[in-house]
């Protein structure tokens, strides 16, 4: 449907029709005047879902969640001025996580900039190097509609290939900014105007791999970082084929699709805290898939061992924070074609599996003896208690580290989502809502500070269609700081690092009309989590003692691997 009341709405209509034909299905927009024609066109398009969200920062992270869930670009629209600046944190996350995002910022025309006209800032290259591509569109003109179409096609392609990420289109508009008819205006498109607008298909890149070298290695590892791919099952199957052929163990981040594979080692983070095992399990070669896992113990061990590393990653990122002996190979795991016949069984693989099983049994005995509200025990039991195919969004900071340490793979096909590009806590709730919107029933695991940092996310509730359970681990402060050397210095530790908040979450939930439940004991925790999915949104509060949990991690968990 092309609107033709005036030049601006025609321009905006052509913009969204072009993006729709390229593959766009969702537009997330925040209200404003200068973006009026664009909002009108998005809302009027019969095949686009247009979602109005008040707060721009929350809207941008919600869009990131949608991109992760849908596996395709989402458009993000705002008016001129500081509105666009509020998109910046999410754009940084999209850039570092290789998530394609189409950022559309309306702007004042050139004659209303730098003259105190109001609601005008310098939006040219506003996001700097965080975007893959920037274009300022011309002011709307009928003869320039083919230029608009081609600019959009190129921008869409750049968002997807060769390195997926955000692109920014700055769109200046003069009045009228509404549906008023324009005198003597006849906006008709030529026949077949959209005929060549087709979804972009990235080319397949073939990279030769050092199979002969790998087959000669007796102590090889596959290390899989967090999965940013849109098809985790295909990625997991590819990693499984590679590990079965080479007979190498797989050390997979809990946020990877490969955690729980037959050759997978779930508890490497605990094993590598033991000095004897660090030497006993020393590798000579590593195939690294994407970025390194979160585990500090793993990173320190690899740095000390200095094995030969081949990093497989199609994005071209420098995934070598240890500055080791690493060769970069621009290929995704799914594109690896393994030779047909697997190698003989490898004693190095069995060593890893035996140690992993020993720790698995030790964890089971340890948690059976705990009756107090242990945050790590909560994470340990989630794979058993959550229904099959639950999507899980894990907040940064302490939750993701506990997941890394004790999450055991299962056959329930849980899929993880996360914001691990910049590793910030901002936008946690909003991103989780985006993941759950019209998607799988979702569980958000978050601490109290991450949840409070994004309370405007609750404003999305009226537009939200889906099932989200927020599992709030409330230890009244930043639990991760308890594990840093600064903990020994109080003051200033408690006030300036732990930053405890005194919010009653039952009142916060009531203010937004969110069902709330404070978990009472372990039987209650299990019963509530087995009820997932829950209609719409609910908040479960797990109250824990920050100091006791930190002390237990340091005195007990850290020594379970030995």
From Swiss-Prot:
Binds 1 thiamine pyrophosphate per subunit. Pathway: Quinol/quinone metabolism; 1,4-dihydroxy-2-naphthoate biosynthesis; 1,4-dihydroxy-2-naphthoate from chorismate: step 2/7; Cofactor biosynthesis; phylloquinone biosynthesis. Its cofactor is Mg(2+); Mn(2+); thiamine diphosphate. The keyword Metal-binding applies. Its EC number is 2.2.1.9. Homodimer. This is 2-succinyl-5-enolpyruvyl-6-hydroxy-3-cyclohexene-1-carboxylate synthase. The gene is menD.
